[in-house]
A protein has these predicted regions:
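Flavin-dependent oxidoreductase catalytic cores
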Residues: 1-180, 184, 188-200, 208
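Beta1-alpha1 glycine-rich phosphate/pyrophosphate-binding loop at the start
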Residues: 178-246
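Phosphate-bearing ligand-interacting subdomains
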Residues: 249
Length: 249
């Protein structure tokens, strides 16, 4: 703190619980926050260490907002703003936690990977178009492997200089392209084609979109897959993409 001026913002990322035997629990982490408070302008509260990795970067079976008590407890003990990550996947959950005093700001890192426009869409009342993080850990897997950051449901993540909307080469000129299959891959292909100026037509032999992902969404802890299907169906309507159900290609 002494190395910078008072108007230079200094924050601290701290745990609310290490979730390992012999580590810092919530009480200890709260005391650490109180000790650091005079030296920082805000706290960013997370939890877990590598020995308790599923609490640090939660997979699909972790309930949304499961650790809210950690940030709320620390927030009540200090007088500087608290940012909290909380496995937030829905804008209304983020807003509710703000109203409940869980934190002053909400961190939604993986949601930003899944859909960088999540806040813009929420403000416009278009939650139906928000692609919500599945908790599939694909992003973490790519980083651990030393590769570029990628997202299973947003092919633009890590490739924006090529596939970002502003960089797409629009050479379609209205030409019709048949897309065989209305699963997530088919719908994503149709969406990209539409943005490039083509006229995609999805041919789906079944009476619904979603492909094998519909079955996958029935498995335990896979409810977010069902939400992804509904979001992509909404995208098909938003971009006026023609869909022919019960029509084998």
């Amino acid at each position: 703190r002494a190395a910078v001026s008072r108007d230079f913002v200094v924050g601290a990322r701290i745990n609310g619980n290490d979730f390992v035997e012999g580590g810092n629990d919530l009480a200890a982490c709260t005391e650490i926050a109180k000790y650091l408070e005079p030296y920082v302008d805000y706290f960013n509260v997370s939890c877990g260490v590598y020995a308790s990795a599923p609490t640090m970067i939660e997979p699909c079976y972790s309930p949304e907002g499961w650790r809210k008590n950690l940030a709320k407890t620390i927030k009540a003990a200090v007088n500087v703003p608290v940012i909290a990550v909380n496995t937030i996947k829905h804008p209304e959950t983020a807003e509710r936690f703000l109203q409940e005093g869980v934190s002053d700001f909400v961190g939604m890192s993986r949601m930003q990977l899944a859909d960088p426009d999540v806040v813009k869409k929420a403000m416009a009342g278009r939650e139906d178009l928000i692609r919500k993080c599945l908790g599939c850990m694909n992003c973490n897997k790519s980083v651990v492997a030393g590769k570029n950051l990628h997202c299973a449901i947003n092919p633009v993540t890590g490739r924006a200089t090529v596939y970002g909307d502003e960089n797409l080469v629009k050479t379609g000129a209205g030409r019709t392209v048949a897309v065989v299959g209305g699963g997530p891959g088919g719908m994503q292909a149709a969406l990209l084609l539409k943005k490039r100026g083509y006229y995609p037509v999805i041919f789906e032999s079944r009476d619904h979109l979603g492909g094998s992902a519909v079955l996958a969404s029935k498995a335990p802890c896979k409810g977010m897959v069902a939400e992804l299907i509904e979001t992509m169906k909404a995208e098909m309507k938003e971009y006026h993409i023609e869909v022919r159900l019960n029509t084998p290609a």
